[in-house]
UniProtKB/Swiss-Prot annotation:
Its main location: membrane. This is UPF0756 membrane protein YPO3057/y1423/YP_2679. The chain crosses the membrane at residues 16-36, 51-71, 88-108, 114-134. Disulfide bonds: none annotated. Keywords: Cell membrane, Membrane, Transmembrane, Transmembrane helix. It is a multi-pass membrane protein. It comes from the Bacteria. InterPro entries: UPF0756_TM (IPR007382).
């Protein structure tokens, strides 16, 4: 019998954590990666590694901007957000979180060894503390502040 692929076992364990924490995004992402790994599609991994985060951020940005583009959030509401203190505070927090996310992308790109820990931590936070899987990017940004890397 051939030896089991340790990387595949890790991916399966992370998928199981995703299922246990009811985090379908993590579960589906890992299952897709498993499918790529065990099929001839594995030749696409260099492309996924190079462009995956960029495409993910693009899709996330589309999702965030969709209510403005669809008209669900009107132009007057957007303009009004610059004069109410809660909205101004929301803008400041949004800038800070975006900055942290940028640091997170940089850290994850330059130190991929932290990715597994961030993912496991995110999944455990969802599973054990009823958290929301807002993402390893922000967690990586916070980590970059702690360890002093950008």
């Amino acid at each position: 019998m051939a030896a089991l692929d340790p990387t595949l076992l890790i991916l399966l364990a992370l998928a199981a954590l995703g299922i246990l924490s009811h985090n379908m995004t993590v579960t589906l992402a890992i299952l897709i990666l498993i499918a790529i790994r065990i099929t001839p599609l594995n030749s696409f991994f260099p492309w996924v590694e190079k462009y995956g985060l960029t495409i993910g951020v693009l899709i996330l940005t589309i999702g965030v901007m969709a209510p403005i583009a669809s008209g669900k959030i009107s132009a007057s509401e957007v303009l009004h957000s610059f004069v109410q203190w809660k909205s101004i505070l929301a803008i400041v927090v949004g800038v800070a979180v975006s900055w942290l996310g940028g640091r997170g992308v940089s850290l994850m790109t330059h130190q991929p060894s932290v990715v597994a820990g961030l993912l496991v931590g995110t999944v455990l936070g969802v599973a054990l503390f009823k958290g929301v899987p807002v993402g390893p990017l922000i967690a990586a940004g916070l980590l970059s502040l702690v360890i002093g890397k950008s």
